[in-house]
Regions:
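DNA replication initiation on ssDNA origins
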Residues: 1-99, 222-225
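Short amphipathic alpha-helix segments
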Residues: 105-129
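A generic structural motif
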Residues: 141-148
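Long, distal/terminal scaffolding or interaction modules
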Residues: 228-295
């Protein structure tokens, strides 16, 4: 089956930052393969002079480089479509969520190590196995790492966990639904998986959406996760596991001895048996483990 790719992109230089359009990957490839973008990237990195800017004026050069960077075409990695082509959070269409995100590595000294570590994580036996989708140098020769989000994990959770595994600081500005990434030239692309910006198979989409819904989130993983009944039970069970039931039984027996005189000893014994049975039932429930659900 043919893999369909979709990308929310503004392919124009000096494009309106509030507008993005849904295209196939050939538009993306056309932009990063253009000579104009290549020249802009070289100028931003100081590899080529900028017309009308004195190379001896460091402040002027820096300002001109920032201006050029702001003029680059851009795309949004989290969603393939925005309502009315307006790039804002509430316009991100949930059904176009791509279940991917981009990690920023802003420390130039760590870029090459991060590339190696990302590849290592991709081949590991943990949750990041097969997660690597894209590696690309940013406009200032830092690093963008595109990854597949583990099933059930939100953008924020994915970013935090991956940054920890990678050994880089977590950046909360990277988790917004409408986040934009400036495009760089083809030579800056280090690696691209065939599943980068791909529409996942319907069965996987449904499984991922359900994993979010089970947590009380929207189908694209937004909102505050609610504590459902199973989670509430888990919390109660955790609390019970901290209780010393032998101490409770001893206290109950002492109270029964004080409350009941010898003629009522039979009643006391019956109550003790009943309480012991209840405590045993609670302990059995505490130690019971719910079977793992396989998707």
């Amino acid at each position: 089956m043919e893999i369909v790719h979709v990308v929310a992109i503004n392919p124009y230089r000096k494009g309106n930052k509030g507008k993005v359009f849904s295209y196939r990957m050939d538009t993306y490839d056309k932009v990063i393969g253009s000579e104009e973008i290549k020249k802009m990237i070289q100028q931003i990195r100081g590899e080529l002079p900028i017309d009308g800017v004195d190379l001896n004026d460091a402040q002027a050069v820096k300002k001109a480089q920032e201006r050029l960077k702001s003029e680059l075409p851009f795309f949004c990695p989290h969603y393939g479509m925005f309502k009315n082509n307006v790039r804002r959070q509430e316009n991100a269409l949930p059904e176009s969520f791509l279940f991917q995100t981009i990690i920023d590595v802003d420390d130039k000294e760590y870029v090459e190590k991060a590339i190696e570590k990302a590849r290592e994580l991709n081949c590991s036996s943990g949750i990041w196995n097969g997660s690597l989708l894209h590696l690309c140098y940013s406009a200032r020769k830092k690093l963008h790492i595109g990854i597949r989000m583990p099933i059930g994990m939100t953008i924020e959770e994915t970013q935090k966990a991956y940054c920890e595994a990678l050994g880089v600081p977590y950046d909360e500005s990277c988790i917004t639904p409408e986040r934009m990434i400036f495009l760089t030239d083809k030579d800056s692309e280090i690696y691209r998986s065939k599943m980068w910006c791909a529409v996942l198979p319907e069965s996987e989409i449904q499984a991922r959406r359900q994993a979010f819904l089970d947590r009380g989130l929207t189908v694209d993983g937004r909102g505050d996760a609610k504590v459902n009944s199973l989670q509430l039970i888990a919390i109660v069970m955790t609390m019970f596991k901290t209780i010393d039931f032998r101490a409770i039984v001893a206290i109950m027996l002492l109270l029964l001895a004080l409350l009941f005189s010898l003629p009522n000893l039979v009643i006391a014994i019956m109550l003790m048996i009943l309480i012991s049975g209840i405590l045993e039932a609670i302990m059995a429930l505490v130690n019971w483990e719910r079977p793992v659900r396989r998707i």
